[in-house]
Amino acid sequence: MNESFDKDFSNHTPMMQQYLKLKAQHPEILLFYRMGDFYELFYDDAKRASQLLDISLTKRGASAGEPIPMAGIPHHAVENYLAKLVNQGESVAICEQIGDPATSKGPVERKVVRIVTPGTISDEALLQERQDNLLAAIWQDGKGYGYATLDISSGRFRLSEPADRETMAAELQRTNPAELLYAEDFAEMALIEGRRGLRRRPLWEFEIDTARQQLNLQFGTRDLVGFGVENASRGLCAAGCLLQYVKDTQRTSLPHIRSITMERQQDSIIMDAATRRNLEITQNLAGGVENTLAAVLDCTVTPMGSRMLKRWLHMPVRNTDILRERQQTIGALQDTVSELQPVLRQVGDLERILARLALRTARPRDLARMRHAFQQLPELHAQLETVDSAPVQALRKKMGDFAEPRDLLERAIIDAPPVLVRDGGVIAPGYHEELDEWRALADGATDYLDRLEIRERERTGLDTLKVGYNAVHGYYIQISRGQSHLAPINYVRRQTLKNAERYIIPELKEYEDKVLTSKGKALALEKQLYDELFDLLLPHLADLQQSANALAELDVLVNLAERAWTLNYTCPTFTDKPGIRITEGRHPVVEQVLNEPFIANPLNLSPQRRMLIITGPNMGGKSTYMRQTALIALLAYIGSYVPAQNVEIGPIDRIFTRVGAADDLASGRSTFMVEMTETANILHNATENSLVLMDEIGRGTSTYDGLSLAWACAENLANKIKALTLFATHYFELTQLPEKMEGVANVHLDALEHGDTIAFMHSVQDGAASKSYGLAVAALAGVPKEVIKRARQKLRELESISPNAAATQVDGTQMSLLAAPEETSPAVEALENLDPDSLTPRQALEWIYRLKSLV
């Protein structure tokens, strides 16, 4: 049965009618329907869940004459199953029993209390602690895109307005949302196809007036001018849809979402999707996290610090005042790293705990962790007090001390609370007098039972008599089978065992009712007091969020100070002059994974030396040299120290890489097509302040086509765009470029060849390489010896036919394309314009004489 089409529920049982009505409100997502200690799924949901979760598919009786497919999960294990579903991009509506079964006529009242979606989760068990979990919305009109992201676990709300498809693709790559909302008429489906968590939304949710109204209502403002987003209509359309979706799914107020920020391209270094992928910033080319820049740089001690560092890495800032401030802070903190990090580690993930507090889903252990974080603040304040740095003191001030909330939680919550409030024992003794009284009554049962047992033994003279309790039958008096015939007349039999009889007496029954009532009252009061704690803590929310942000930033900066010291990094110098000058530069990741010492190399790019043509053997280190330059620039522009002896760096607006390629089979694009698409993006968007890495342009096509393209690209970058360019190539003909244009220089990575073996020197030298060592590298890779031998024969043949094929000279026919374009011969022009079919024999003879004179 497909319940989405069956709107007539009258043939079904009352319980299934209730289920189907709730399911009709959430047709696209799974419905977890609470029945006692289980969440049940029925019909199509049950079939899907059994496949997604690998749980048994059973049947539950029949309704409307058909057996009902059913699958269920225990309520106490729901978080594990939700995590599995969310990781697969599924959303789930959680339906709880809100009525009392004892007083309900017919099915117990139920309602959907929350909707769990990949982009709106805040539960600790469902989130990866060191990664942001973003919900995003995308909007498109004739002028460009609107894009909004929200991290519900921190309240961070951002919007941007990418102007074109490439910029939009780069934003999707950078933010990597867990869930993406798009309009039902979204035109560029190819841009988002294959992404996880896609959600199609109706057009009206993106309506601009509704968006402004929703946002003003959320922030308690009359307009959005104060946020700097008033005129960002495309971005606001996306933000409005996103906020509406969050309200629909969370079904509670969102006090931690207090502002929205515009992300402008001119504020950060722009990197397209290919560049982020090629530089392996937070994800390697295989999709893992090993051997990435973040893996080397991230030794933060709090999850919120780790997430902030990754945001910095993906959005390097161009404001050198901010960068110099970060550098100064890192320098000032280097002497206190060993004292600060152990204390910061105890702060934990305050940012996400605060989000759960705002959503009123924080659990007792969240509040205990929050208390523990507050308890670290005095020591952090004391340690930072002596640091002579204005930025550090500003962070110290933002951290606050929160003595009042700390005192409240120390009084209210026991040291090691249980997981859930409903388990009881969360509120500390002494916090509330009435609660203590109910607990005393419930807990005083042991003393009473001991006294009752002694009294009844003496009264009856039965030495086997004892008083006990179990969860099924409650309190009882037990007498052995041998003495049971002596039980007094007022003993009412409650249970018969193999060797004993159990009884109840009116006094014990009355006490049992009182104890059970007191336990229930204690639990109800405890729940009420717990909810009141939220009301007492929430007025501090804005200051607490500021504190969490300051603590995360402190963690990042202390981490960068530790990394700089441990990895021997240096503080780069920013200059207004264009260019990059690096002394003894190293690749931050490669140097960590190598078993032998890394060979450091210099680099000098300036307006007078804008392009380096890099030649040398495969495996010689060309790609490493290029990538290390980009990574050093990237690290400098997050304010970090860098792996080099000395670095001076000028303004950079974009980093481009055209490094390596693979077929994009899903889009039907070959390696060469991918390569040319990325190259076109660079040639259209690079400026004189861009850093461009071009590796092996033109290798995916024929030699002459590839060489022609590589030459023309290099010429365009050096002469027209004037970008700072590293251009690696195996076309030795390109080493003649420095002779033909200004601002271009040759460098090479050397190797030594001895017989069939080759030693890579990995050091960068001025000038062009003498040869490519391709056969030696092939031998090293294990190509069979007979193939290498045949290749050497063929190479000698080719070199004898065209001595220039493997040399750096550019004479002869192969390099004619590099000479100035020749003027067309008059004789050729005349022949091209000639129509031989229209000539008489006499005219043909005259033409021969005329052509002879033109040659």
UniProtKB/Swiss-Prot annotation:
GO biological process annotation, one example: mismatch repair
A molecular function GO annotation: ATP-dependent DNA damage sensor activity
Positions of ATP binding: 616-623
Pfam families: MutS_I, MutS_II, MutS_III, MutS_IV, MutS_V
NCBIfam families in UniProt: mutS1, PRK05399.1
Biological role: This protein is involved in the repair of mismatches in DNA. It is possible that it carries out the mismatch recognition step. This protein has a weak ATPase activity.
Descriptive protein name: DNA mismatch repair protein MutS
